[in-house]
């Protein structure tokens, strides 16, 4: 009987230090990418003195596909989007219905809205075929962190990419995960991403018409840093990273937030922003995209999940 696959931890997790400035940015490679070659391109860029002095590699591990499946890491990571893909039409909030009507110019009641899994059956497509189904850019809408694609005859599919994401993560695909601690803000970090993207294109590992997220993911905001960290950072085969290990969580703790509050932000990110007389529905991940820790925390002060 073969032993269970466990993470290969090359650089153990360095716990967060609330007295040390900087933020966590987690990077992990897509399972369909060529991991070894992609890592080579990535570390070649990072070895440049321009970036090396501003980044600290605080974790590096390889997560076996079998381990990812066993712990349902992908399902937990995409839990909110997975819920919308499963429930389809019934998952839409009133604000989301209005946004769809405004963007596509069709009454919500007249639209045939399918969750991604229902669409696979009705349209008789594979997960990859649904994901790759081309439509013009004006037929794709992001609402509250959910992706809606309009097909023919006013058929709409919500989170059409989720089945393919789940399918690509299987026992034979390993994922390399890195944590970088950096004093760079997101404006300063973006040129690094562009340099990596350019090098991937030069190495024929990325289609110039596609975004870098086809090859790798990086945390795009403080709350996504927490989501990525709790899902993909493992101290051992049995112990995940905790909130105490992550810089933004330490920052929130210092502001008086409890673990329970923080975890609720991650599991129920859609809420209402109270701005005077206005009540604006927001997804906290989208709302704090590329924010500093201070900016993201301030936005939570008027954010309510009871609506």
Residue ranges: model-predicted function:
Residues 1-307:
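Non-catalytic terminal and connector segments of soluble metabolic enzymes
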């Amino acid at each position: 009987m073969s032993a269970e696959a466990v993470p290969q931890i090359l650089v153990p997790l360095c716990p967060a230090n609330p007295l040390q400035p900087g933020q966590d940015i987690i990077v992990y490679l897509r399972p369909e990418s060529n991991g070894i070659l992609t890592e080579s391109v990535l570390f070649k860029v990072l070895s440049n003195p321009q970036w090396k002095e501003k980044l600290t590699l605080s974790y590096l591990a390889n997560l076996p596909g079998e381990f990812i499946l066993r712990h349902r890491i992908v399902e937990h990571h995409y839990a909110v989007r997975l819920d919308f893909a499963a429930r389809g039409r019934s998952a839409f909030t009133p604000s989301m219905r209005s946004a769809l009507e405004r963007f596509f110019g069709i009454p919500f009641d007249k639209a045939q809205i399918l969750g991604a899994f229902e669409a696979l059956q009705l349209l008789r497509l594979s997960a990859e075929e649904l994901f790759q189904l081309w439509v013009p850019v004006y037929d794709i809408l992001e609402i509250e962190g959910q992706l809606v694609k309009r097909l023919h005859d006013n058929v709409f599919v919500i989170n059409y990419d989720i089945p393919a994401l789940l399918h690509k993560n299987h026992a034979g695909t390993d994922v390399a995960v890195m944590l970088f601690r950096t004093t760079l803000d997101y404006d300063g970090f973006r040129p690094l991403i562009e340099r990596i993207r350019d090098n991937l294109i030069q190495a024929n590992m990325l289609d110039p018409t596609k975004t870098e997220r086809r090859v790798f993911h990086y945390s795009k905001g403080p709350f996504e840093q927490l989501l990525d960290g709790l899902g993909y950072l493992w101290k051992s085969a049995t112990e995940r990273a905790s909130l105490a290990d992550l810089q933004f969580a330490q920052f929130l703790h210092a502001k008086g937030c409890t673990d329970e509050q923080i975890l609720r932000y991650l599991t129920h990110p859609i809420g209402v922003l109270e701005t005077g007389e206005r009540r604006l529905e927001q997804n906290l991940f989208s709302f704090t995209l590329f924010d500093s820790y201070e900016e993201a925390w301030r936005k939570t002060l008027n954010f309510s999940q009871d609506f």
